[in-house]
C-alpha cells in the first residue's frame, strides 16, 4: 500500500476527508515551501500539491499565475522542485507529496529522468492538468515503474463515456474539477457537483478529491458530504501574498487549521 492509499484509508477510518493544500514551489520566497509544508502538515493537512513554476500556466487563474511568475523570478526549476521534495522528506514530512506541472517542461526535462528523480526524492506522483488521456500513454507506464501515481482529471464537462475511459487508467485518486474555467477562489461550488461525483462513484472505488474554487470551511464541509478530499490553492496563495513575511507561516497555518476543522465526513 503506497503513501496515498494509506493516507486515504487512515482518513476514512477516522471519519474525515483529506485537505490538500496547493503551494507553488519557491513562492513567496525560494525557501518558503520548506517552512510552509511541515507547518501545514502539523496543522492537519493530509497531502500536498506542489506546483512547478511554468511561464504559461493554462489552467491557472490570476492568483496562481502571479505566484508562478514570482517563483520563476526566484529561479525555481523542475530540478529544484524535486530537490524540495527530498528536503521535505529530510525534515520528516510524512504526507504524500505530488508535483503539479505542465507537460512540455516535463517532456523537455525527460520523463524517465523526472520520474526516477522524483521517486528517489520521496515523491508520490504527478498532477498534470494539460495532459489528456491519450497523451498520458507515454508517461503512465514510466511513472508506474517508479511507483508514482499519475492523477487524472474529471470536469463537469467530461462526457460519461470519457469518464469511463479515464477511470480505467486512473491511480492514486481522481481530481474532480468542481467548476469550469481556471483556478481561483469562488463564493460557491458548482450546483451539479453532487451529480458529477455520483456518476464517477458508480465506476470506481478510488478516492475523489475536489479542487478549483475551494476557499472557505463551508466549501470543505460541502465536499465532505460528497467526496474524499478537498484541494485549496488560490485562496491559500492569496493569503501568502497578502501576509507580511513574518506572519506567513502562522497565518497560513491558522487558515489551514480552520479548513481542517470542516473535514469531518457526514455521508
Curated annotation (Swiss-Prot):
E.C. number: 4.2.1.20
Q: Which residues form the active site?
A: 49, 60
Q: Name one Pfam family in it.
A: Trp_syntA
Which pathway or pathways does this protein act in? Amino-acid biosynthesis; L-tryptophan biosynthesis; L-tryptophan from chorismate: step 5/5
Which key words tag this protein in UniProt?
Amino-acid biosynthesis, Aromatic amino acid biosynthesis, Lyase, Tryptophan biosynthesis
Catalytic EC class: lyase
Single Gene Ontology MF annotation: tryptophan synthase activity
Kindly list the GO CC terms recorded for this protein.
cytosol
Q: Which reaction does it catalyse?
A: (1S,2R)-1-C-(indol-3-yl)glycerol 3-phosphate + L-serine = D-glyceraldehyde 3-phosphate + L-tryptophan + H2O
State how it assembles.
Tetramer of two alpha and two beta chains.
- Role: The alpha subunit is responsible for the aldol cleavage of indoleglycerol phosphate to indole and glyceraldehyde 3-phosphate.
Q: Which HAMAP family match?
A: Trp_synth_alpha
Family, per entry = Belongs to the TrpA family.
Q: What is this protein called?
A: Tryptophan synthase alpha chain
Q: Which organism is it from?
A: Chloroflexus aggregans (strain MD-66 / DSM 9485)
